[in-house]
């Protein structure tokens, strides 16, 4: 397990991390979310000693992270850090050597990951002559070449086409099933919702919400509800609901259906009774809020 405990980091008058704490269970795929400037990249850099916190600790498997443990980490930074004049396979193998592999093992692993990531035939291509998407695949191979126990990816899906997104998502799931722990940041919340079991949301340098996504959605303060009647009930037939049903807000509708957001405290049976008093109800769909809605609520509050 990765444990980030009470990290504090100041840059002059700017408080980048304000007691940030987050746990990443072993073998889990965790999305680290937050608006721009929330502190996501700073957290990731502290894991690798690129940023030294003013306070707080980082532990891996119960021990403070040091140079030796970092050799078992893989990192894909937001600012891609490739050597443009090096050939793809040569570059990946070079980082494999830095990760502790022998020359032969590093070269073999480089070829294997290039094949796996759709870069077969480009082993001898200079990095600066590859497309943006293929450069990103080389950067991912650099992070994976030494088979790390912890994989940290800063905006790995940025700039990828839909097919490449699907390939990377499937790979991350496969890695986690094999026991790799993965922490990644992304602004693509729909993708994170489909991909992750766990999320942590940062704002102003601290974690404002974290946990199992299914539990966060089930326990959210507001939920979505759509009600459809069997006949047209006229314009704005739902207007009285805001008075009769405290905690119910109308998001929109027409003569036959209405979309609502309801507080967690609202008794849904009362909503159904109110709808049936208007006309026959043919649809009564309840959905927990999306990750995007949870994110906005957490950051606003």
PLM features: what roles do these ranges have?
Residues 69, 220, 295-298:
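Short, flexible helix/strand-to-coil boundary loops that buttress conserved ligand/catalytic motifs
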Residues 5, 228, 285-287:
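Solvent-exposed beta-strand sheet faces enriched in polar/charged residues
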Residues 169-262:
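ABC transporter nucleotide-binding domain
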């Amino acid at each position: 397990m990765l444990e980030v405990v009470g990290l504090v980091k100041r840059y002059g008058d700017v408080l980048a991390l304000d007691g940030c704490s987050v746990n990443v269970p072993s073998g889990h795929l965790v999305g680290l979310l937050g608006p721009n400037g929330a502190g996501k990249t700073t957290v990731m850099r502290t894991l690798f000693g690129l940023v030294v916190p003013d306070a707080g600790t980082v532990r891996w498997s119960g021990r403070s992270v040091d140079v030796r443990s970092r050799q078992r980490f893989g990192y894909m930074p937001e600012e891609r850090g490739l050597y443009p004049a090096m050939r793809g396979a040569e570059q990946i193998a070079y980082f494999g050597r830095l990760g502790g592999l022998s020359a032969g093992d590093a070269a073999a692993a480089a070829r294997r990951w290039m094949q796996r990531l759709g870069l077969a035939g480009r082993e001898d291509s200079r990095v600066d002559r590859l497309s943006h998407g293929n450069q990103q695949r080389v950067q991912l191979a650099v992070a994976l070449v030494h088979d790390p126990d912890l994989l940290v990816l800063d905006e790995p899906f940025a700039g990828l086409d839909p097919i490449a997104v699907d390939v990377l998502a499937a790979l991350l799931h496969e890695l986690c099933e094999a026991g790799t722990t993965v922490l990644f940041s992304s602004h693509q919340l729909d993708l994170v919702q489909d991909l992750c079991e766990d999320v942590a949301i940062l704002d102003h340098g601290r974690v404002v919400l974290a946990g199992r996504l299914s539990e966060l959605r089930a326990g959210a303060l507001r939920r979505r509800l759509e009600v459809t009647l069997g006949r047209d009930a006229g314009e704005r037939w739902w207007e009285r609901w805001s008075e009769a049903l405290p905690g119910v807000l109308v998001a929109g509708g027409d003569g036959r259906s209405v979309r609502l957001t309801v507080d967690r405290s609202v008794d849904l049976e009362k909503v159904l009774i109110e709808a049936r008093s208007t006309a026959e109800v043919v649809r009564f769909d309840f959905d927990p809020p999306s990750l995007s809605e949870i994110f906005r609520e957490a950051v606003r509050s």
